[in-house]
Amino acid sequence: MAKTLYEKLFDAHVVYEAQNETPLLYIDRHLVHEVTSPQAFDGLRAHGRQVRQPGKTFATMDHNVSTQTKDINASGEMARIQMQELIKNCKEFGVELYDLNHPYQGIVHVMGPEQGVTLPGMTIVCGDSHTATHGAFGALAFGIGTSEVEHVLATQTLKQGRAKTMKIEVQGKAAPGITAKDIVLAIIGKTGSAGGTGHVVEFCGEAIRDLSMEGRMTLCNMAIEMGAKAGLVAPDETTFNYVRGRLHAPKGKDFDDAVAYWKTLKTDDGATFDTVVTLQAAEIAPQVTWGTNPGQVISVTDNIPDPASFSDPVERASAEKALAYMGLKSGIPLTEVAIDKVFIGSCTNSRIEDLRAAAEIAKGRKVAPGVQALVVPGSGPVKAQAEAEGLDKIFIEAGFEWRLPGCSMCLAMNNDRLNPGERCASTSNRNFEGRQGRGGRTHLVSPAMAAAAAVTGHFADIRNLK
């Protein structure tokens, strides 16, 4: 029987399945950070259990860390406790930890792929909703809750029901300057923020195949923002070339054998999906969100929509509420909306290609008066590479702040946050009310679009800046 990629991955990991019972899946990789793990480790202690396969669990610090100093006390008492607990727990249970002073420390979804922890064909979980990022490798990756974190630590398995399948095909080639972030925002604009609920999404089409691995990670990172359980891109030569030679990747003949298997990880001809969505890549322009969920998004050249234009009463009410919170009026061109802060970073857009794209816009320009702009690399290796390429100097000379790795202003769990009423052009993944700070107003954009907003002081079409 013809199978989708998701069905192949799921079936390959079923440990036990009985009639009328939820299947038990084997978990190949478990990624851990400081926020969702303390209670899970305490649960192990309470029951006298060990981590079943510590070599398949990798930990880092990211959510709470300061991006201005490596001092563990810098982000407040709760953050200090969570980070100290992670150090204690990893030492006690034999889990590898990339702590604040480790050269590989960084955002968990940047660190995993970078170190070859993430490989095609795997099941990967983490107590974080953006675990879908790793689906870019043709891995079944999804976020789990703290009680599930404990279950995986103790058993290396997890009960999971089968999801519905969705194919999202982006046909043709994207125009120059259109990034993975623009593509995925355009997709969510079409599906809505709940359009993928109950599904695992496979992204395909020429525009997807043309993306680098970093672009595919941006794409899959935001699968959760359309309500999907996970996102997938079938592995190909782009994938294999990225993985080759990384720290935890197979070596020599083992790598060749792995590639032979990975090449089978694709949807069979004749396999059927529950839902199919199609977009034309050539029609996608630079995207900017205007509301308080990622589905409230338009092209930078568009005017802010009138709530009355939505036929669905729920969408209309949501648009009215969003405009009120965002302090915007319908009919205004997005390019007339001024910003206060810019955040370039997060597990969506903090990799080296993202920083290069932003630096290309920043080079030779200055951050607009009254704007604070942060650039936060996703990991120690990304920071080191950016500095080796001189990107830090470009940013600093332009008036951007060059920070240490961490989740930073993506979420208000550390010192980087918006003040009430401040408006931010952000390369992160969520624009919910208060996500970047109480009363903060978040607009999601690509790294180049964020840099353009920083140097102009308002949203600007990057196609007119180059």
UniProtKB/Swiss-Prot annotation:
InterPro entries: 3-IsopropMal_deHydase_lsu, Acnase/IPM_dHydase_lsu_aba_1/3, Acoase/IPM_deHydtase_lsu_aba, Aconitase_4Fe-4S_BS, Aconitase_4Fe-4S_dom, IPM_dehydratase_rel_enz, IPMI_cat. It catalyses: (2R,3S)-3-isopropylmalate = (2S)-2-isopropylmalate. Keywords: 4Fe-4S, Amino-acid biosynthesis, Branched-chain amino acid biosynthesis, Iron, Iron-sulfur, Leucine biosynthesis, Lyase, Metal-binding. This is 3-isopropylmalate dehydratase large subunit. Pathway: Amino-acid biosynthesis; L-leucine biosynthesis; L-leucine from 3-methyl-2-oxobutanoate: step 2/4. Catalyzes the isomerization between 2-isopropylmalate and 3-isopropylmalate, via the formation of 2-isopropylmaleate. It comes from Klebsiella pneumoniae subsp. pneumoniae (strain ATCC 700721 / MGH 78578). Belongs to the aconitase/IPM isomerase family. LeuC type 1 subfamily. GO terms for biological process: L-leucine biosynthetic process. Binds 1 [4Fe-4S] cluster per subunit. One of its GO terms (molecular function) is 3-isopropylmalate dehydratase activity. Heterodimer of LeuC and LeuD. Its cofactor is [4Fe-4S] cluster.
